[in-house]
Every structure is written in structure tokens, then in C-alpha cells.
């Protein structure tokens, strides 16, 4: 009798994806982030579901319903903070995952990579809409500022913004639709993640050396299931340290003030994981130019496969490209810092220089270093 694991139509899919999957024998801890993102998504869907049971998407009661969750619902505070900090963990894993892809040349799997970019946009949209739901000051003004950016689109801009708002300003209709979208998008993300995996399993995983690993494969279970569980334990440890010791560390104190359309906060800024893109947006004095730069800050990832000039796939043996990669990481940290600063003299210039450097690394310096390294190989 055949093993049910290999014969049952449904169990067979799980078996081929997580148990008998042939995996390269040398993939490092940087390959853990895919499974960690899956865990983050599950945590977010579960905690979000329980929050949605008590939340009301009405401008008059939204803020108090979140307060009610924290004060009166059994373990409501831990569910709420796991959801808020879970989003931060999600983005940390996402940035690490994308960074790994750039460093080791995983972007040469173009279908997987492009679905990944689509996933990133969807996750960012979901997080933005989730930030609006508590209806604090930063929720309201963040929603106003970010949705207003669409008015920069020529001809249809103003109509588009009012259509998204459901009126002439961010109000009850906006909050209700944002809640609806925030609820449905994680399930769309789950479907996209399944497609992401489907495309990945067509080619098999990349590995740190960037060479074909067909001659040396090991089964996913038990080797990488155990390895992923270690990563999972560390993720949960960090998440629970955040939730139980400093739940508001990554949040904005302004969001504990109920939304007031008549009072603008001194510094309107998004959550920390959007600050790098926000800094790029602000560094361009033109509204439409800023919006384009904002979109391109993520969309530039789609151009990387076309600009891969090196004969080697991975950066493992390419010191020049490695230096550029870590310069990019430092640049992103600088942009994140600038995004949280007021629009004043030194910060404006630093932001503009960091933005120029960001695009230069992707579009000019990395392809150039690939060509130079090819020449050095012949030398």
C-alpha cells in the first residue's frame, strides 16, 4: 500500500511543498525568512480576526472600541499589541527576505521575484489601512496626507481622491471601506504567497553560492523544518519581548489622541517601516515627482533582474558588490531616520543625497560593479 502522504491528493501537495521537497544542502539562516513571513501572516490573520470581533468601524466609536478592547476584553491588550507589533516583525522579516534576494541574486527567478514585489505592495497597502483604523490623530492625518498624494495624478487626480474618500474629506465612509479592505487583503496576500511558492518550486531554491545545486539536494523535512522552528522561536521571543515589555516602542504617541480634523499634529509621519519611502517622497519638491519616486522606491526592485551584469549570480564572491550592498543598507537606515525628522535645513539635504544614492546604487553603481568584477576575473 502506498504511503497516504504520497497518494492522497491534498496531503500530496503538502508533502511536495514541506516534507519531501528537495532543498539545497547549503542554504543559510537567511533562507528562514520565507517561513517566518508565513508565520507572521498567520499571527496577523488570527489576532486581526479577534480584534475585528470587537472593533467598530465608525468615526464616533472606532477610537473607544480600541480602548474597550485594551481595557475590557479578556486578553484584548495582548491581542491588540501582538497585532500592532506583529506588523513590525512582518516588515523586519520582509526587508531581510528582500535583502537576501538582492544579495544572493535570487531575483533571477523573475516570476517568483515579481510576485514578491506585488506581495510587498499589497502588504504595505494592508499595513497603511490598518494604521488608519484606531482613528487616532496620526491615523487620520496619515490617511489624509497619503491618500491626498493621488491628487498629483494629472486630470483624474482630484476625482480619484474623492472617490477613495467617499466624500470631500477623510470621514466615516473612508474608515468603513479601509476596514473592509484591511480585512480582505490578508487573504489575498495568502493566495499570492501560495502563487509565490508555486513559482519558487518550479525552479527550486537558490543557495548562497549562487550555483546550481541539483547534484546536492536534501529533503526539506527534517533538516529545514527544524531549522525553521529555531527561527520561529526567535521570532516569537522578539515579538513577545516587544509586546510584554515595550508595546508602544515602535508606535506614535499622537495616536493615543482621538482624531481631530481641526488640529494638525506637529509632525505627520507614518509607521517606522514606511519612513524610508516617506523620506524619498519628501526629498523631491514637486508633488507628482515625489509620488513617482515613492512608487519607484519599491518598483526599482523589478528592474534589478534586467540590470544584472555580473557573470556570477550571488554576491558571495564579489567584494565590490558586497560593499555597495552594505552601503545600500546604511542608506536605507539613513532614509528611515530622515523620514522621522522635521522638514528643516540639514535633514532636507541629507534626505535628498540619500535618495539620489538609493537610486544610483540600484541603477548605476551595481551594474557598473558587475562589469568591473567581470573584467577583474579575466585580469
UniProtKB/Swiss-Prot annotation:
Membrane topology annotation: Multi-pass membrane protein
Gene3D superfamilies found in the cross-reference section: Cytochrome Bc1 Complex, Chain C
Gene Ontology CC annotation, any one: respiratory chain complex III
Location of the protein in the cell: Mitochondrion inner membrane
Record-listed a ubiquinone binding positions: 201
Role played: Component of the ubiquinol-cytochrome c reductase complex (complex III or cytochrome b-c1 complex) that is part of the mitochondrial respiratory chain. The b-c1 complex mediates electron transfer from ubiquinol to cytochrome c. Contributes to the generation of a proton gradient across the mitochondrial membrane that is then used for ATP synthesis.
Family: Belongs to the cytochrome b family.
Name used for this protein in its record: Cytochrome b
Organism: Genetta thierryi
